[in-house]
Amino acid sequence: MESLPRTPTKGRSTQHLSTPSPKNDILAMNGHKRRNTTTPPPKHTLLKPQRTDIHRHSLASQSRISMSPNRELLKNYKGTANLIYGNQKSNSGVTSFYKENVNELNRTQAILFEKKATLDLLKDELTETKEKINAVNLKFETLREEKIKIEQQLNLKNNELISIKEEFLSKKQFMNEGHEIHLKQLAASNKKELKQMENEYKTKIEKLKFMKIKQFENERASLLDKIEEVRNKITMNPSTLQEMLNDVEQKHMLEKEEWLTEYQSQWKKDIELNNKHMQEIESIKKEIENTLKPELAEKKKLLTEKRNAYEAIKVKVKEKEEETTRLRDEVALKQKTNLETLEKIKELEEYIKDTELGMKELNEILIKEETVRRTLHNELQELRGNIRVYCRIRPALKNLENSDTSLINVNEFDDNSGVQSMEVTKIQNTAQVHEFKFDKIFDQQDTNVDVFKEVGQLVQSSLDGYNVCIFAYGQTGSGKTFTMLNPGDGIIPSTISHIFNWINKLKTKGWDYKVNCEFIEIYNENIVDLLRSDNNNKEDTSIGLKHEIRHDQETKTTTITNVTSCKLESEEMVEIILKKANKLRSTASTASNEHSSRSHSIFIIHLSGSNAKTGAHSYGTLNLVDLAGSERINVSQVVGDRLRETQNINKSLSCLGDVIHALGQPDSTKRHIPFRNSKLTYLLQYSLTGDSKTLMFVNISPSSSHINETLNSLRFASKVNSTRLVSRK
């Protein structure tokens, strides 16, 4: 037991009493200005009667303690101390009361300092962790860029060396061989053609002359021999010779006649042949004069040009040889540079190996950091509140609503309190101003992209394995469906895009996800499958197949029997699914809206993740709920089927408010929660309890004509916003 300070008496000196002087303490406290969160409290602010263990707690937390949250306690303390000081001598009971309050105040101060120190430590750890992750990512990107740059430089140098070698060889071969061969071929062909033609004609002429001369010589020799033989015979035997002469003469005459006849015919033939040959010779001469000589002149001219070109080529070859010499020197220099580059490459390869080892270690660290990130992200979301309420004000409809929206005033976000406030003015007999506070308020100029920047954190929680509910609440025509389902930037399309982007990022850390979805509506407390195959029929024709809600107590998961489940593999599939579901959703015309949604639509996304590297598993469910319009019956002016629809809608919305209110009670873990009062709350039972996260969008109209419905929606949202979930096992 802690000993109480003794009461001062007249016989004792007050210097030795354990009770501090209230006046001195109050003066000491007033003498200190307000400190920031990092300034430790002065020792004399902790009053002397507290125990030493409490004093140690306060000293350990000195670097992170703020006195600002204790103003009211200090004011109470001052008032109590002044009261006690004024009546100390006359009222010993008041002195005892003061002592008890001093101890309680010290205890409260110590606890408060300890809590704030813990909070600051957690914030510092979170900041350090983020800085480490950023530094690791920066180092990794720098190393990767250096590696790519070095590889590109090496490839460029190799390509330059290869191109220089190929160009050198091709130039040398082409210049040295091609031109020489071509010149030799031209000269040889010209000489060969001229020589061949000249030889052919000479041969023909000489052959003709030789044949004629030979023929005439042979005939003359033959005749001379015969004459000589006859002369010899005449000399030897005149008679015989005479006879023989006669015979010979007779025979000679015959032969002469035959020869003359033959000679004449042969002579005629020879003359004709000679004339023919002369004509051929003349034609050949003409051809030589007319054709071959000009060709020869052209060939000579071409030969001269080729010789000149050859000389020019020789000059170029000489220049190329000089250039080749220069290139050889450059190649030698390049080879030297390449050797140096190869040495650098070896060094870089070793560096890359070391870097790869470091990267492997970094990957392992990143995998661990992902687990830490999930934990810190969840703690951050819990600090912001497991139940959050955002308000969204849609723009006024042109030509349909009053453009004066001054009845609603939105204030700036308060960083100190972490909330944003708004005032709504209702003018009846007098102006009544109603103030509401929410976690975030989106004004008329804010877009769906701005909205999803806040929603994306909760979508991330579903990927981390938590159940998440996002509601769009408000009167008909307030923009709920636009917020949830607008193509391209609505919460549902943006959520799918966010999920697939993060799935691709997490693949590098070993995570593999399977994404399945269901799309249902709750119409008159009946579940309707919006993804059924008979999409031409507006009614759910699966008669005999009841849609029942079943809960698994062990795994804390919920299933709906006989509904269509689709495996999502791309963002494009979601567009098709949403178009199909919108065609089948129940809508009708009311006094508030021509196309009023008469049911609650729920887009359920199941996210099952596993990590092959760490063996970790996660399973989260994301419920995106577009609630039906929340207007009153006397405003919507409905009858018949529309009246029954409105009654069921208002009943389920009321049950949702009752469930959330019951979950926020201190004894909610022991008391009964009325989940079964509506199909909506029963379906979302495990997404509203435990570590689940809930976000409600209250959508309102800025028009003064809807001020009553706007106030009703804001009051309901304020009731939800005041709830703080208690974890239920």
Curated annotation (Swiss-Prot):
Entries under InterPro entries matching the protein: Kinesin-like_fam (IPR027640), Kinesin_motor_CS (IPR019821), Kinesin_motor_dom (IPR001752), Kinesin_motor_dom_sf (IPR036961), P-loop_NTPase (IPR027417)
Effect of R598A: Disrupts microtubule binding. Abolishes microtubule-activated ATPase activity
GO cellular component entries: chromosome; cytoplasmic microtubule; microtubule; microtubule cytoskeleton; nucleus; spindle pole; spindle pole body
Residue spans of biased composition, Polar residues class: 10-22
CDD domains: KISc_C_terminal
Principal location class: cytoplasm
EC numbers for this chain: 5.6.1.4
Task of the protein: Minus end-directed microtubule (MT) motor involved in spindle midzone assembly, poleward transport of newly captured kinetochores along the lateral side of MTs, karyogamy (nuclear fusion) during mating, and with an essential function in meiosis I. Functions together with the accessory proteins CIK1 or VIK1. Drives the poleward transport of newly captured kinetochores along the lateral side of MTs, both during S-phase and during M-phase.
Protein name stated in the entry: Kinesin-like protein KAR3
Organism: Saccharomyces cerevisiae (strain ATCC 204508 / S288c)
